[in-house]
Amino acid sequence: MHPFCCVTTVSDHSPSMPPLPEPQPPLPNYAADFGSARSEPIITRSASQSYNHSGQFNNNLIHSLSFNHHQSDVTDRLGQRVLALPAAVREPPVDVKINDIVGNGIAGILYKWVNYGRGWRPRWFVLQDGVLSYYKIHGPDKIFVSPETEKGSKVIGDESARMISRHNRRGGSSSSCQLRRKPFGEVHLKVSSVRESRSDDKRFSIFTGTKRLHLRAETREDRTTWVEALQAVKDMFPRMSNSELMAPTNNLAMSTEKIRLRLIEEGVSELAIQDCEQIMKSEFSALQSQLVLLKQKQWLLIDTLRQLETEKVDLENTVVDESQRQADNGCSGELRHEKFSEGTATESDDDNERGDAAEEEFDEEENTFFDTRDFLSSSSFKSSGSGFRTSSFSSDEDGFESEDDIDPSIKSIGCNYPRVKRRKNLPDPVEKEKSVSLWSMIKDNIGKDLTKVCLPVYFNEPLSSLQKCFEDLEYSYLLDRAFEYGKRGNSLMRILNVAAFAVSGYASTEGRICKPFNPLLGETYEADYPDKGLRFFSEKVSHHPMVVACHCDGTGWKFWGDSNLRSKFWGRSIQLDPVGVLTLQFDDGEILQWSKVTTSIYNLILGKLYCDHYGTMRIEGSAEYSCKLKFKEQSIIDRNPHQVHGIVQNKSGKTVATMFGKWDESIHFVTGDCSGKGKLSEDMSGAQLLWKRSKPPGNATKYNLTRFAITLNELTPGLKERLPPTDSRLRPDQRYLENGEFEMANTEKLRLEQRQRQARKMQERGWKPRWFMKEKGSESYRYKGGYWEAREDGSWVDCPDIFGHIDSDQQMIE
């Protein structure tokens, strides 16, 4: 609304006004001076219309001032016509259109999309006062409607009318009707947008900024009526730019100069002219100030509504997470499946709705990013006979359950290795951990060189980055199965298992908020795990940039790679982009390669710290098939995060399989191309499990380590004597932290970091890694062999004691 469209006179009862002069003869109409060729509507108000006793505008002030069509000019307090406003500075009379379309409200049945399992569900929608509310019409929370409750509202649709008639015949007290009219959800049209579907003439959607409602009317005409009503209500809210709000009042003097000259020519006294000018200036100034204030209040209200919506979502997520945790602790897997599969009477509609995959634009390239949670909990998937459960973790330690469709000979792979007894808990802490504030740490180090600031060990977990590389191989049985499938000529199942393995490496990052130790230059880590049928070795090969290289020998396969991270700090978050290629080579000669996706860590300063992985991962090589995996980025209020969607294509580009799941739970697949719009629900019965995350330890550690991660830093009997002096298990600060000796851990960490600052000089003098070398014509590192042979001989002559103490006179030469 333009600020000049509501010009009015000052109240006769203002105590600050001077005495009224004698009445003057009426002035001629000078509307033509403002470029208007027609008579314009008058805009007047009395004292009672202008302000209430608290100094606020009346509710209907704007409409009563803007669209009064009974006179043509603005009059002053003397009854004289002062000016007529041009049409360009007034908004169109949309209230007339709104009254014609909306009246006192709109009501009726619309079908709301819930999820793939429940589909379209009827809801009773009511549009009133700029708010679209909806109610359930079935179940204990259903709404009761009648001609009395819907009095004054325009009811849309034959089915809606029949429902009112049916409820009216059954009868019901007015009080009971009001008690049942508690909305199940609300949408404020002020901050929403409405869009019609192009593919279905009965469907439309409403986007609120935080969620999308997909709705379907009975007929095409009903949709048109609803959309027109919604749009008309939206048009009722004025849209004004800051430049319009802050328009200077000095323009008023320029605009009235012509009238001033004409009035002087007509013989009007100078006192009367000045009085009119003062009245207009005062009114314009007061109105402009009020509009600016109202605009500010409007934005504050919108921000408050958005904040309340976010807090509501967070609270609902907390309740759902707590319910799931209690169910996991006290119920069997089957009961948990029933809990998450069936919609209950008290279940929130917003927990079940994730939008229509045909309309959501999560991924333009692949058409749809379907809701994994809703898919796995749908009734059609549940009844497929696959036996898969939708609980977050399997009930055993190795994650081999619920694989009834897998060949028994394949299923047994990974289970026939010798058993090795490993620890299940970290040692009990010796000391009580001190609470450390990040803010206090920043305050204590103001003005210092941050590169020389030693972060306390309270921000670390008792693992190094070298050990974290091996943690990605927790589900190495997937590679064993991939090798066996390839031997049998099933290349499709081979790449599907490799893709599941590539995703499984991210599962251990969920809930891990502490950073691993940064290895020293030349630090190594070995993992001889006969219970997994593999041997792993890694080494830090470069300090600037920090590069870690690794190599692993498995059953029928070899895996190697190097990793370097490029970080971007965004204030409240940090983005980590991996640089490097991971290579998998099977003994039959087939090679597959891929790179990791982007990882971001959020809420570094305030809020709950969490990480997310997103981007596209492509698995390609000499194989018959290639795979593309899309990790969906988590939004701030996403209720179903961590989704992964992938497709497997042959050399001709045809999609032969579709993968879906969550990187912290499980991955499933169906054969054929099911990534198109709406296709997923048609092929639920053929879904098969590829991988499921292992169950977390019974006694969770403060670091949220997995069962597998707890074993990585363990010194089993006789192992210490066989390790080189560079192994991460022998690093003192890391060992002290694991034992809960925090003071000693901090002391040792400071000592080692001071020593590590000499690593750049070592590297500049031509230092080379002991067990890895650069490939020719590439920046990648390959294992050159010899480690396990040296381990057998116990010969570590060339390995420096990088963790030992160095006297000041034995410091590295600068």
UniProtKB/Swiss-Prot annotation:
Tissue specificity field: Expressed in roots, leaves, stems, flowers and pollen.
GO biological process, one term: lipid transport
Biased composition (Acidic residues): 347-366, 395-407
Lineage top rank: taxon: Eukaryota
Chain ranges of the PH domain: 103-235
Keywords from the named record: Coiled coil, Lipid transport, Lipid-binding, Transport
Cross-referenced SUPFAM superfamilies: Oxysterol-binding protein-like, PH domain-like
An annotated Gene Ontology molecular function: lipid binding
Compositional bias segments (type: Low complexity): 379-394
Function comment: May be involved in the transport of sterols.
Family: Belongs to the OSBP family.
Name under which the protein is recorded: Oxysterol-binding protein-related protein 1C
Classification lineage: Eukaryota, Viridiplantae, Streptophyta, Embryophyta, Tracheophyta
